[in-house]
Amino acid sequence: MGETSKWWWIGANHNTSNSSPWLNSTLSELDSKTKEMLSVIDEVEDEGDSLMKRAKINYENKPKLIELLEELYRSHRSLAQKHDLLIKTSSLNSDSHNSSSCDEIRSEVCEETESSDVEAETEKDQIVEFDDGDETMKEELEILREENRVYKEKKEVVTRLLANLVRVCFCFQFNWEIFSYHLLRFCLLFSHDPIGGWVICTKRFRYYFLIMFSF
């Protein structure tokens, strides 16, 4: 598989400087699994110069490919669940923060007519703390948007990778149909000896059939 066919893979080029350690770890693991799966596909396309050799490589790499798909699925699911949890937590914190802010404002307005100079100074400190909390919330929302963007990019990666796997399987099925046609012609060559031709064709067909349908 050439480099031009991997233009969709972000790999280590994504910017995660503002991301959480958990997200960085998850993305690194996802990149590693993606690289391994691409390596398996490359091995089939580069070394499978014949139908038999390609069938053998597919058979040997099938367990590894299934294992990588399972790990990729778990990483993708974990990332989606984490994203959903952050969305809900952010929404709850925002509602709680707004409710608390309204209560504080009402309290400050009521106390303003009766407060002394000392109480007025305390009120100023509370307003400063409120502004600091609002800035913190903005930073958290910005980080969440970044993580959501990266999540969408990784989702596209998984979709394109599965599309490539389907393409490889389709090509393999097409080669099998061509092979069946040539096997039939081979049997016809032994038509002068019906018994011998039948025995040889049956043995060869059984051998190739077991290889092809063991996937």
Curated annotation (Swiss-Prot):
GO CC terms of this entry: membrane
GO molecular function, one term: actin binding
PROSITE patterns linked to this entry: NAB
Coiled-coil blocks: 134-165
Residues in NAB domain copies: 5-90
Lineage top rank: taxon: Eukaryota
A Pfam family of this chain: KIP1
Keywords attached to this entry: Coiled coil
PANTHER family: PROTEIN NETWORKED 3A-RELATED (PTHR32258:SF28), PROTEIN NETWORKED 4A (PTHR32258)
Subunit field text: Interacts with F-actin.
Family assignment from sequence similarity: Belongs to the NET family.
Function: Plant-specific actin binding protein. May be part of a membrane-cytoskeletal adapter complex.
Protein name: Protein NETWORKED 3B
Lineage: Eukaryota, Viridiplantae, Streptophyta, Embryophyta, Tracheophyta
